[in-house]
């Protein structure tokens, strides 16, 4: 009992020293916790540290509520050995939970979004604010719970209770980390969704503006092409008439030229009694008669 009194007296000195630096703080010596709620003496702590306790299988986080800490008949060597091994066991369980899940059979019906407008597809600001508030609230509650479990762990005298509290702290820490990551991912997805919808809306507005500009340009082209088409048709008709007149005139000129040409003297008719050949023959005969 003297050792216990001295231990509590030292604890009182430490608490008074820390309390002197604060205000409105009552100095209270909290007793060590046991599963049965009774106080623990130094001799009892020594006996409990030497005792073994049943082997406890660490469950996955989704089966923590149904987990019985009293299950199993196997015995462990030391309570401290269990506390060191629990980190590896929990790490294996967390890795199993985080293993990739086959999603080949997962089919999402996207046709339900075809009839929705851009405003219906966007995430409201109230929903995004709710996600952020939920994340902060969950973080605050779990951190407070972890602090309570840590305080109980530091004051626990039973090895079984220390292991139970350490397991709870590990599970709560893992759950807080995963929940924060999931909620942050959901918020980022909603932000990306709203950003893409905003860009799509801007593209739709630009498309409508360009369509109206194209209609205006086509209307202006039609207004200019109407008179120009009529003029071009008249010009084509005049060009056709001009070509016809030129062809007729060229044919008439060719006919007149052919009629005014002299007779062709390259060929002679030997039987004809008119022309140059008979005259030459007559002159030749006259010369022969004169000479002869």
UniProtKB/Swiss-Prot annotation:
Residue span of region Interaction with NKP1-NKP2: 268-292
Primary location: nucleus
One record GO biological process: cell division
UniProt-listed Pfam families: CENPU
Region Disordered, annotated ranges: 42-63
Keywords for the protein's UniProt record, in alphabetical order: Cell cycle, Cell division, Centromere, Chromosome, Kinetochore, Meiosis, Mitosis, Nucleus
Domain of life per record: Eukaryota
Gene Ontology CC: kinetochore; nucleus
Entry keyword annotation includes Phosphoprotein: no
Compartments it resides in: Nucleus; Chromosome, Centromere, Kinetochore
Alphabetical list of InterPro entries matching this protein: AME1 (IPR048743)
Region (Interaction with OKP1): 129-247
Protein family membership: Belongs to the CENP-U/AME1 family.
Quaternary context: Component of the heterotetrameric kinetochore subcomplex COMA, which consists of AME1, CTF19, MCM21 and OKP1. The COMA subcomplex is part of a larger constitutive centromere-associated network (CCAN) (also known as central kinetochore CTF19 complex in yeast). COMA binds the centromeric nucleosome-binding protein MIF2, and to the outer kinetochore MIND subcomplex, probably via AME1. AME1 interacts directly with OKP1 and an NKP1-NKP2 dimer.
Function recorded in the entry: Component of the kinetochore, a multiprotein complex that assembles on centromeric DNA and attaches chromosomes to spindle microtubules, mediating chromosome segregation and sister chromatid segregation during meiosis and mitosis. Component of the inner kinetochore COMA subcomplex, which connects centromere-associated proteins and the outer kinetochore. COMA interacts with other inner kinetochore proteins to form the inner kinetochore constitutive centromere-associated network (CCAN), which serves as a structural platform for outer kinetochore assembly.
Name of the protein in question: Inner kinetochore subunit AME1
């Amino acid at each position: 009992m003297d050792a216990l009194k001295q231990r509590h007296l030292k604890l009182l000195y430490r608490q008074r020293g820390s309390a002197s630096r604060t205000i409105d703080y009552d100095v209270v010596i909290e007793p060590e916790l046991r599963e049965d709620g009774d106080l623990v003496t130094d001799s009892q702590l020594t006996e409990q540290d030497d005792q073994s306790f049943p082997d406890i299988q660490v469950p996955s986080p989704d089966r923590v509520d149904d987990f019985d800490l009293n299950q199993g008949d196997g015995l462990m060597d030391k309570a401290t050995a269990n506390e060191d091994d629990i980190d590896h066991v929990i790490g294996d369980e967390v890795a199993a939970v985080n293993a990739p899940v086959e999603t080949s059979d997962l089919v999402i019906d996207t046709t339900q979004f075809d009839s929705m407008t851009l405003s219906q597809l966007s995430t409201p600001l109230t929903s995004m604010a709710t996600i952020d508030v939920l994340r902060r609230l969950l973080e605050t509650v779990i951190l407070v719970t972890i602090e309570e479990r840590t305080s109980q762990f530091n004051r626990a005298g039973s090895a079984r209770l220390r292991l139970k509290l350490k397991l709870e702290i590990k599970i709560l820490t893992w759950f807080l980390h995963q929940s924060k990551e999931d909620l942050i991912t959901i918020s980022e997805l909603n932000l990306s969704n709203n950003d893409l919808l905003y860009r799509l809306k801007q593209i739709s507005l630009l498309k409508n503006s360009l369509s109206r500009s194209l209609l205006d340009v086509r209307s202006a082209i039609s207004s200019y092409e109407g008179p120009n088409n009529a003029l071009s048709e008249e010009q084509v008709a005049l060009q056709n008439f001009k070509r016809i007149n030129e062809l007729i005139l060229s044919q008439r000129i060719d006919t007149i030229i052919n009629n005014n040409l002299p007779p062709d003297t390259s060929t002679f008719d030997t039987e004809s009694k008119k022309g140059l050949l008979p005259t030459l023959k007559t002159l030749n005969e006259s010369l022969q008669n004169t000479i002869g």
